[in-house]
């Protein structure tokens, strides 16, 4: 719980206004001890100033030295009874010539007559001399000793000043002086002396003594108005208005006419007795005027101070306007009070305007003025303005006083910058020499308590006690609240007990906090005892505490105490049965609550809407809906004519519990509230506000229409909400119309946020002209646009990219005000970014710096974000470096932005450095950043680091989200590990997270590539069963899987499902179907699909023809394929790269030379003779031509160049044109068809990645790579790593598995490459073994690729179970695989492959037999070890 607003909300501005009388006394003690030399003077209290037409003059001149301002607020300086006494004394000085001197002793320093004494110039010295003597007395000495000594001759007027001067330090010594004068009969008690002593006692809150003296002196001087005024001042200080009123009546009975001071004092008493009710200020002013007097500045200042104390802005404005209307000149106090009330009400701009007006009217701001303005900006947490005001305050010669420190400390506390607040507190004690007061400690303790730093708060309390400052009630309450918030119940109880022991009487807040702590800690018995104490002290708990108490009593079944509590609520709190029922419901005492409500209705209580809503809301929140319905039935029976009210209450109840859908159903269903029987404005407003809060703007618009149709007047809050609604709906014109209508009805919005919303809505609609007109209308109506309005207009320009117009507004603000802020600068830069003129950002920034603006961190971040959105990593890094050099430390948002940009740009090293830098700066890496790293590593296929990042996420305690799981699943899919991805998806579902559709698609595709058809189909069916709307790509993916499995029936079924789902097949869809027919060996079915396509109006390309032709060529029906080619030619379609690739690929798999020539001759006939010319002889002459074709194909989509070159390399390798294949492969690298680092032989980086290569291309690349590594092994440079990795992948390319093909080749050569144990699709060799093999193996003696002298008659390669293998190796390969199966090492395979068939069979038999014998021997050895173990154990068994 927080300390009450009255206690801590404004500790720095108004000490006396916010503390109770006891705290005022303590504050007065502090002020008297810390700053006794500073005395506040008020010139208008002087009679010569107040009544210049009487030509009065002071007996003494004012001190020429500059008077210091009081370190209190404008409210603290309000003219009270003490100031009134000073004013009386000034007036009485004119009458001292007529006063008779009392008898004096003969001992005189110098004989003077009365006139000489009055005219003496050294009266100040006499008063000061005697005052110092009296105040220097010890506690056991008496004033009489000084006065009897007659050290200096004094007049009665002098003694009055002595009483007042001594009373400033000690009321006891002042009373001694007064009593000594009475006992010695030195002078008769005149009105001036009595007024003086009453003023002293009033200041020290010695009311009883003041009453006694007044009663004793009244018969003698009772007809003097100043005595009554002084006594009224005593009552005024304690807020006893009735007593002051009685004195006014007594004055009139005695014939003493009250003067203006009397009424000012009476007004002060009335305002201190209670808050400023509406129109009370006007009534009090009328009271003064009805008495024939004219209110002066003190009258108005008293009222303004009360308004400031209560934060009553409307009242203050009315008083100030009345003051100006009656031509009463405002003074410095007036402006101080108005600045204070504006600051308290959060209108710092108005406070600043008054401050400027004050200086223009010739007043000089004092410390109170600056502190009030300082507080106004501090309340808005405007640190820059606070610094600006403080610097101006210092320039004017005012240093930091206690109020200044308290204000800034309070601001830092509200901002949560407690370290700065504590540092300021230390500076206050050390550097400035100011002594912290009770307010300082209270503010710090309250701020620390709210931040759960209760240990430091308790230490401050101890320090406060050590320096002799008594904690106030608010101090104790703040610490108790801090303990309560931190859940430290025992410490809160100890503090409360300490407060009681110190004599501080708890107020309602202290009792309430402790009661709340005990009740929430289930200490019901202690809470009950404290509650009884609270009741006995005259305090009553709030409704909420009663609810908690009843809840606690219910848990312990203390029904008697519940009944007592109900009686207290009824008798002490005056709660009616309806209110008691509401409390009981919230305390879960439902039976008694229902009984109370029924009693209320039976007794004739009128059912009130708010009460009914409270009860029903409690039922609803506790889930007791049946009881709520029963209650409504009772109300329908016993509360006649309440049907509409009950329906409205139900609607409002639904709104209160935020059940908007039910409220709308009830609203639209019942014609009593929605139709011609109109509802209440409360129901409309509640439903409308609920719709706005839940962002149901369309329904809110409907409710607003019904409200206007019903004739209900829209309130100001409704108009504001509807402006928001129409702006959110994108109807700024309608919103503008609502504002115009509201202003016609008398609502005055000034430059409220509504105009800002309208201007911003116009900006979002790109209607900057209308946004401009809104501001123009405001200016024409005499309303000066404020900073937010100008910024909104600039933002509208920025949305449209109108930089020049935004700059014009910026220049207007520079010229006419208000001064542009950081937000204004950011909007200006944003306009430049939207306009696409990023290159001009630096120029504008330099211009702003030349104008004196400091570019803030937010502006730099805006520029950085703009370049980041543009993907300009260079500029982003430059700005980032400059920002760090300027001292701006990066924030978590900046790190997130930078890392996301670097990850999108795949700047791996930079991203890793940024993450490390972030961790070194003690920032916790957010999940979003880790997700960006996951995406980057997945994109670059660094799956090892992807897994490491996921492990880091779990180690740091972060919970992976949907993005994390989706990225990881996609990573597993790309890494050919769909089973692990599926398990992760299951884990994701168990956590309540839904995978994205793209994740499902990747997983289905991965299962298809792994030939896991059942899992892929299961996932697809699962998506369909969920009713999700799948796009065309899902069906295409499943059709590709069906194609690869050779199941054309499934492809047909998928096509039908696709049509049933409302997705029209495209040309690509039909191509997939035809390829499925081709894979299953049904080219005729594929041709039927093509015929059907011809009958439609679809414009055909070579894609469907290539599918049909490829189907015939795969089934070895070359003639039919050629016929379809010629048909396509006749139909006007020119064959392209798809057709060429089909024929070249088919030629590479043809077994005989004649078949190859047949296919290539067909291509030559249609105008593409490059393949046949490469095979015809002297292919080296065609290098430039081949390069030209590759360049043309590279620009075509669908991997045209890659597919064609792969097929061509297959053909060249198969028919032993391997030198030609070598330079064709290198041309492919040159043109970017193949990756530049398809194989690498660099320093400590030997590796290759042959994925995306065909079988022939992979064999060419392998030979070239081995040749490069052999050269490096012989020369010793580049140095090899510890192991060499060859990535083959697990996919098949047109029926060829690279993994199987490369294994067969390397195993035949006896290479040291072995399969990776942890990942499939990888071959790994130890570098040392690889180098030795390259140097010594006979297979590596000649790795140069050469062309055959003549084209062989048959294909040198064969395709066996996905393995593109040398045809001569096929018998040995099949024999070894059949006999040994499983894994055979490369060396063993190479040795067996070279043997004749019979010898190979004997060697295999011998190997199998040797392996069997080895296993038997190992089994016997194991059994022997077990037997030895048994004997060994028996050896140590002791015999009996």
UniProtKB/Swiss-Prot annotation:
Q: Which InterPro entries match?
A: Pentatricopeptide_rpt, PROP1-like_PPR_dom, TPR-like_helical_dom_sf
User: For this UniProt entry, which residues form the secretion signal?
Assistant: none
Transit peptide (first-last residue):
1-44
Segments carrying the region annotation (Disordered) are 63-84, 1419-1440
**GO MF term list:** RNA binding
Biased composition (Polar residues) is annotated at: 63-72
Give a Gene Ontology cellular component term annotated to this protein. Answer: chloroplast thylakoid
Identify the stretches annotated as PPR repeats: 224-258, 259-295, 296-330, 331-365, 366-400, 401-431, 437-471, 472-506, 507-541, 542-572, 608-638, 643-678, 680-714, 715-749, 751-785, 786-820, 821-855, 856-890, 891-925, 926-960, 961-995, 996-1030, 1031-1065, 1066-1100, 1101-1135
Q: What is its main location?
A: plastid
Q: Which SUPFAM superfamilies match?
A: TPR-like
Location of this chain's protein in the cell: Plastid, Chloroplast
UniProt entry keywords in alphabetical sequence: Chloroplast, Plastid, Repeat, Transit peptide
Entry's Gene Ontology BP terms? chloroplast RNA processing; embryo development ending in seed dormancy
Function text: May play a role in embryogenesis.
Protein family per UniProt: Belongs to the PPR family. P subfamily.
Protein name (database record):
Pentatricopeptide repeat-containing protein At3g18110, chloroplastic
Organism this protein belongs to? Arabidopsis thaliana
